[in-house]
Amino acid sequence: MRKYTFIGILILMAGLGAACEDQLNALPGQSKVEGNVILDQKTAEVALNGVYYRFADGGDDRGTPSTMWASSHEISPGLLTGYIRYPYGSVAMEENSSLTANDYSVANLWSGSYKIINAANGVIKQIAEVDDNEFVGDRKNEIIAEACWLRAYGHYNLLRYFAQFYDQESKYGVLLRKEFVTSSNIAQSRSSVKASYDCILEDLDFAERYAPDENRNIYVNQWVAKGLKARVLMMRGTEGDYEKVITLTKDIIEKGPYELEENLKDIFKEKGLASKEVMLGIEPFVNQVRHYDDYAYREEPAYLRTTTDTLLYENDPRGEWMRGAIGEGEGITKYLGNQVEVCYAMRLTEMYLLQAEAIVRSGGLLSDAKALLKEVMGHAGITVFTELDAIADRDELLFEIYKETARNLMLEDGIEWSALIRLPMERILEVKPAIREQNYIILPIPADEFEKNPVIGDQNPGYSKN
């Protein structure tokens, strides 16, 4: 079984000729070099696994190898959206407009994305120089495709958090990195929003075409490439994008190897990665406890639910198991159970909800969107749809789709934040008044970036560089 290992082109591996299984289960080395470590398919697989290790935010937790996905992918978006809060005072992400370029969590979101991108660039560059005969069948292109997906994911994260994603004409796009960073090329300006979308979609086109048709659900395949492309096109929302989202998600739902879990709760409490609904998940290391501690540290809630969260789950059966008592407080219990250490990057439920949103936004039949929404809600234990059936207004149905997206996919991969900031500003402020204005649906570029890369360009509007 492959395990996440940070190799890439950054790690000097001891005993490169050892068994592949041993390599993939080894801890990262300490010596970092820019060396040619991809020599054949075997070493390419190890290097690719290093990119997945970065994707999972692998590291060391009190001496135990652990995946630390939750911090940036679950907790930060939950704070930004206003559904959870820190129990001991407050943190800047709870008051969006008070964030600064020196915020630690903002820096983690930024640097984590570039770690994925840089590791992916190393694989893409190195593997291109290896003879095709060193690979079995189409595996060379498949590895490049998986690395392209991971690079696209990193750039997508930066686009949704740090760029004016909603304006194709904006200069406030992503600092795109398509080459492995060295001292000679670290100085680079950020690109436009249009160029950012073009770069991400180019990588996803390659991934969709060449990624494996089948792969364990902790690795990328063609269906996962289609899923991320649907996310990106929904965020862009230009002419024809919603129709493409409908086509992509229909293809995944009707032809892909996934099924909605009969009972949503079973994914988190019993099945984990064994669920056929999980398109892409994060496999934990043996003996790690990091994800449990992210929500129930020392048997007390690490984060509390907010009033907004309480209202969201009012009269919803999920409120009985996704939230609950932890010690003396009302905390987040969604993950607590037999599969507590597993995290989720993409589930089939999201494809249903993206399709429903795209139908409404493209002027399609509200009844079609409602049917998709009912399917998802039914698997979550909802049996009465009187209020949903009564909705006749397109904007109201969009908001209902948003609320189901938040209820179902909250604290997984920032889906609740991405869905919120696609709404009109008045709706955004209804959910999270602390955002105040449009500038604050975007985060500040970390101050450290302006020191390392002074040619990057302007800070995002509403923030200072330090």
Which residue ranges define each predicted feature?
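Short, surface-exposed recognition loops and adjoining beta-strand edges that mediate ligand/DNA contacts
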Residues: E34-G35, R62-G82, A163-K171, L175, ...
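Short coil/linker segments at helix-helix boundaries
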Residues: D138, Y161-D198
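Acidic, glycine-rich segments characteristic of secretory precursors and extracytoplasmic regions
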Residues: Y4, C20-S71, N453-N466
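Inward-facing hydrophobic residues that define packing positions of alpha-helical scaffold repeats
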Residues: I117-A120, Y197, L204, Y242, ...
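Hydrophobic-face positions in mid-chain alpha helices that act as interaction patches
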Residues: V46, P65-S66, Y242-T349, I382-L388, ...
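Conserved, well-structured interaction surfaces
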Residues: Y86-F162, L204-N215, N338-L348, A358-L365, ...
